[in-house]
């Protein structure tokens, strides 16, 4: 009797420990609530929980305790016989107070809850468009930047991989054709497009960030600081390339102006040298002609003098 009586407390302790283990095992899994925005018509709340001992049921309740009918429900069991529950509800109007997802286990008569408070700002159309799964402007922006960088990488790879001379000739031909048709604007767009996209990232980010809702008292301060940083960076990134372009343009114009006087002086010196050489040649020709004329005159004079002497001699001989 004494030995059997001494075993009863241990038996009851083991039974209570096992019962507590079963109760804990039945509700050991956490409840997770996710918020999704399939479109701009409402919010989709999704509640999931797993590793539950069947049977168990999942219900949604509002702040007044009223049951909210679920839009979709799903349950499954794994190999160990544990239950996995998933259900969702679609809220199109603003909810006052918390929304509760509860799981009730029939076997253990135990209930576990998880609540979520939805701010009114989440039901605004502009905030829904930020959280929706639709193709948004930031996605288009990022895809454009990735595509342009990918295109530039392909061009550089082709230039370094195969026949760089032919590729450079082709690119120079294309750039000359574009320059002849569209002028300097095309070159500026080609060179500055990525820079403009990088500069435009900050205003786009801030505009979307300001439309988001944060449960933080310092959010306005953070937004103002971010706007100031955005303005400063934008001014710097626009001002310095503008100054560099103006400096290059000024140096180019100054170089062209400074190159004009030496060119005119060289032309004048060349002309004077040519004129002097021509005058020297003409003077030499004149001297040669003068010498030729003098020799001819002297010859003619000598011949005439000889003929006169012959005539005089013949006259005297006849007489």
From Swiss-Prot:
**Which intervals lie on the Extracellular side per UniProt?**
27-139, 205-228
Q: Which InterPro entries match?
A: BTN3A2-like_Ig-C, Ig-like_dom, Ig-like_dom_sf, Ig-like_fold, IgSF_BTN/MOG
- Where are the annotated coiled coils located? none
Q: Which SUPFAM superfamilies match?
A: Immunoglobulin (SSF48726)
Gene3D superfamilies assigned to the protein according to its UniProt record, in alphabetical order: Immunoglobulins (2.60.40.10)
Found, by tissue, as follows: Expressed in skin, thymus and testis.
Regions that span the bilayer: 140-160, 184-204, 229-249
Glycosylation sites per record: 105
Location relative to the cell: Membrane
**One Gene Ontology cellular component:** membrane
Question: What highest taxon heads this organism's lineage?
Answer: Eukaryota
Which residues lie toward the Cytoplasmic compartment?
A: 161-183, 250-319
Q: Which Cys pairs does UniProt list as disulfide-bonded?
A: 47-101
Q: Any idea which UniProt keywords this protein has?
A: Disulfide bond, Glycoprotein, Immunoglobulin domain, Membrane, Signal, Transmembrane, Transmembrane helix
Membrane topology (UniProt): Multi-pass membrane protein
Please tell me where this protein is predominantly located: membrane
Domain Ig-like V-type: from-to ranges:
27-117
Specify the signal sequence span: 1-26
Q: What else is known?
A: Encoded by one of the 11 copies of Skint genes clustered in the D1 region of the chromosome 4.
Function of the protein: May act by engaging a cell surface molecule on immature T-cells in the embryonic thymus.
Q: Which family does the similarity line name?
A: Belongs to the SKINT family.
Protein name, UniProt field: Selection and upkeep of intraepithelial T-cells protein 9
| Species name | Mus musculus (Mouse)
């Amino acid at each position: 009797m004494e030995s059997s009586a001494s075993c009863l407390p241990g038996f009851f302790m083991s039974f209570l420990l096992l019962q507590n283990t079963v109760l804990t095992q039945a509700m050991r899994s956490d409840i997770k609530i996710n918020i999704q925005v399939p479109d701009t018509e409402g919010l989709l709340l999704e509640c999931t929980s797993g590793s539950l001992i069947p049977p168990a049921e999942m219900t949604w309740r509002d702040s007044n305790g009223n049951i909210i009918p679920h839009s979709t429900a799903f349950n499954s069991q794994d190999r160990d016989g544990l239950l996995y529950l998933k259900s969702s509800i679609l809220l199109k109007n603003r909810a006052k107070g918390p929304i509760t997802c509860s799981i009730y286990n029939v076997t253990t008569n135990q209930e576990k809850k998880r609540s979520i408070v939805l701010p009114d700002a989440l039901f605004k159309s502009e905030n829904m468009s930020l959280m929706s799964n639709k193709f948004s402007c930031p996605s288009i922006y990022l895809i454009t930047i990735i595509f342009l960088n990918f295109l530039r990488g392909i061009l550089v790879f082709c230039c370094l991989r195969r026949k760089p001379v032919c590729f450079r000739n082709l690119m120079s031909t294309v750039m000359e054709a574009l320059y002849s048709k569209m002028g300097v604007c095309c070159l500026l767009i080609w060179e500055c497009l990525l820079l403009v996209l990088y500069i435009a990232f900050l205003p786009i980010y801030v505009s979307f960030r300001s439309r988001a809702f944060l449960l933080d008292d310092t959010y306005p301060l953070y937004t103002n600081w971010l706007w100031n940083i955005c303005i400063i960076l934008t001014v710097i990134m626009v001002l310095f390339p503008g100054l560099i372009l103006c400096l290059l343009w000024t140096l180019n114009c100054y170089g062209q102006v400074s190159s004009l006087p030496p060119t005119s002086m060289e032309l004048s010196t060349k002309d004077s040298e040519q004129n002097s050489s021509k005058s020297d040649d003409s003077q030499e020709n004149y001297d040669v002609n003068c010498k030729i004329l003098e020799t001819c005159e002297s010859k003619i004079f000598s011949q005439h003098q000889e003929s006169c002497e012959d005539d005089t001699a013949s006259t005297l001989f006849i007489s």
